[in-house]
C-alpha cells in the first residue's frame, strides 16, 4: 500500500542464521551449497505463526508477503509489483547479519508485513508478548524504486525494470502458447493496464442500502429460474447472487424443458450460467442452442417466455454464447453477431477492469459511469459484431482496448450487450463471482474492510425491483 504513514517489518520464522545453500541466488551461480536454512525451533515457529494470525484476524496487516524463492529482495520487489506507483526505502542496519548478500538473498522462512503507524505499538506488543523477533525495515516512497542501505552502502533497484525482468520468463513461455502477437502485447501492456474503480456516489457498500439480508428464510414471491445443461458449472454462485438480491431461485435443467416438466410460465427471470455445456465439443454453446432449437417443447417454452412483457433474462459466459447463438439479444438484426475464439487462442482466466457506459438496460442502467473489477474465464469470448457500435445497446466494455485488458479482442472492447428494450442481457465476465469485496482480485483499499457487497449486487437488485413493479 503506497502510504507514507505505514512501516514495513521483517518477521523471522526460522530462528536460524541467514544461509544461502539451496537458494535461487546459489543456483544462479551454478551452485547448490551445503549450508541451508532450517527451522531451528518448532515451538518458536508455531508462536510466530499464531502471532501473525492474530495480527491478520485483528485487521492490523495492510500487506504482506512470505520470504521464499529469491529471498528478501524478491519479496520486497513482488510487493511493489502489485502496484503501478511507488516503491520503498529500506534500511538493513538493524539486521544482525553484516553480509548484505545473505540478507537480501537468503531464503530463511519469514515474512514482510506492512503496518499502519497508528497501529505499530499494538503490533509490537503482540509480537513481543509472543516472544517473536521482528525488525523494522523502512517505509513506502513515491519514487518508483527500492532503495536499500546498509551502513555506508546504498543500492537502488528500479521497480519497473525489475518487474520486466521478473516477467520475462512468463513472456517466453507465453510466446509458445499464444497467437496473433498476444504474448508480446501482454508483455508490453500488463504494467500499463491497472484495474481502476469508480463507484457511484450513492453506493454505500451495505446490504441495508438495498434492503437485503443473507438471513432471509421466507419466499419473496419473485421467482427466477437458472437453466442449465450438462457441463454448466456456475449455477451455485449465480443462485446465491439471485437469492441474496431477493429472488426465489428455481433449478431447471434442459431435460425438464425438453420433457415438458417445466414451461417457464411460473418465473419472470431466467439465467443461463457459465460453464462448458456438452464439453464445447461442437463449439461453445452450439449443442446447448440445439437443445432449444430442435426440441419442440423446449423451443415453445422459450418462445413464450420471450413473448411476455414481464420477463428478464441474463446469460453469463457460456450463457452469453448461448444467447448470441440463439439471436436473443438483437433479433431485429438481419446479420447476427457471433462469439469467436479469443485472439490469443488460449483460455483466458483473469481479473480485468470493466467500464459501464451510459446504457438502456434494466440491470446495468443505474451503474452507468462505474468502473469495476470482474473475473473472466473463457476460450471463445470475442464479440464479433457486423454493425457499427451505435446499433447495439452496450452495457459493459473492457476498460482497455488492447490485450490483455481486452482479453479476447472483442469488437469495440465490448464485454456485454443488452436487447434494445434493456430487458435481456448477455455478457462474458462473471459478475456473480465478484459481488463481495473478498472475491475480487483487487478492491479499493479504503473500502475492502468496510463494504459488505460490491456494486455488482445492484444489478441483481435492479432486476428484482423491475419485476416487482411489473407483477404488482
Task: Describe the residue ranges of each PLM region.
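N-terminal beta1-alpha1 cap of cysteine-dependent amidohydrolase-like domains
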Residues: 150-316, 320-332, 340-348, 411, ...
Amino acid at each position: 500500500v503506497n502510504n507514507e504513514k505505514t512501516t514495513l517489518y521483517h518477521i523471522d520464522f526460522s530462528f536460524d542464521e541467514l544461509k544461502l545453500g539451496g537458494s535461487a541466488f546459489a543456483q544462479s551461480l551454478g551452485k547448490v551449497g551445503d549450508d541451508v536454512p532450517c527451522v531451528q525451533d518448532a515451538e518458536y515457529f508455531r508462536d510466530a505463526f499464531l502471532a501473525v494470525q492474530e495480527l491478520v484476524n485483528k485487521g492490523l496487516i495492510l500487506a504482506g508477503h512470505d520470504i521464499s524463492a529469491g529471498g528478501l529482495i524478491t519479496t520486497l520487489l513482488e510487493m511493489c509489483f502489485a502496484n503501478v506507483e511507488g516503491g520503498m526505502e529500506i534500511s538493513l542496519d538493524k539486521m544482525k547479519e553484516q553480509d548484505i548478500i545473505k540478507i537480501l538473498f537468503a531464503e530463511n522462512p519469514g515474512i514482510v508485513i506492512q503496518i499502519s503507524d497508528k497501529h505499530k505499538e499494538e503490533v509490537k506488543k503482540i509480537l513481543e508478548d509472543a516472544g517473536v523477533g521482528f525488525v523494522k525495515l523502512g517505509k513506502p516512497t513515491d519514487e518508483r524504486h527500492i532503495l536499500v542501505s546498509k551502513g555506508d552502502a546504498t543500492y537502488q533497484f528500479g521497480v519497473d525494470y525489475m518487474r520486466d525482468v521478473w516477467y520475462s520468463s512468463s513472456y517466453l513461455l507465453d510466446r509458445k502458447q499464444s497467437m496473433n502477437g498476444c504474448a508480446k502485447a501482454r508483455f508490453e501492456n500488463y504494467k500499463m493496464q491497472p484495474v481502476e474503480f469508480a463507484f457511484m456516489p450513492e453506493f454505500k457498500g451495505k446490504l441495508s442500502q438495498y434492503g437485503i439480508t443473507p438471513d432471509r428464510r421466507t419466499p419473496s414471491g419473485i421467482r427466477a429460474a437458472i437453466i442449465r445443461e450438462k457441463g454448466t458449472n456456475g449455477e451455485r454462485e449465480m443462485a446465491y447472487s439471485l437469492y441474496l438480491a431477493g429472488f426465489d431461485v428455481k433449478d431447471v435443467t434442459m431435460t425438464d424443458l425438453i420433457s415438458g416438466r417445466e414451461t417457464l410460465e411460473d418465473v419472470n427471470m431466467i439465467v443461463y450460467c457459465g460453464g462448458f455445456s456438452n464439453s464445447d465439443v461442437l463449439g461453445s454453446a452450439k449443442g446447448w442452442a440445439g437443445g432449444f432449437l430442435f426440441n419442440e417443447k423446449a423451443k415453445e417454452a422459450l418462445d413464450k417466455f420471450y413473448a411476455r412483457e414481464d420477463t428478464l433474462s441474463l446469460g453469463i459466459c457460456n450463457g452469453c454464447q448461448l444467447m448470441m447463438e440463439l439471436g436473443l439479444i438483437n433479433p431485429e438484426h438481419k446479420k447476427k453477431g457471433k462469439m469467436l475464439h479469443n485472439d490469443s487462442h488460449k483460455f483466458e482466466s483473469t481479473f480485468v477492469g470493466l467500464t459501464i457506459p451510459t446504457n438502456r438496460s434494466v440491470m446495468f442502467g443505474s451503474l452507468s459511469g462505474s468502473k469495476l473489477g470482474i473475473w473472466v474465464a473463457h476460450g471463445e469470448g470475442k464479440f464479433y459484431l457486423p454493425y457499427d457500435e451505435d446499433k447495439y445497446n452496450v452495457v459493459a466494455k473492457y476498460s482497455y482496448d488492447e490485450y490483455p485488458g481486452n482479453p479476447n479482442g472483442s469488437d469495440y472492447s465490448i464485454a456485454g450487450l443488452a436487447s434494445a428494450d434493456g430487458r435481456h442481457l448477455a455478457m462474458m465476465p462473471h459478475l456473480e463471482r465478484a459481488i463481495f469485496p473478498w472475491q475480487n482480485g483487487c478492491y479499493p483499499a479504503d473500502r475492502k474492510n468496510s463494504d459488505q457487497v460490491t456494486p455488482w449486487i445492484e444489478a441483481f437488485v435492479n432486476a428484482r425491483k423491475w419485476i416487482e413493479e411489473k407483477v404488482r
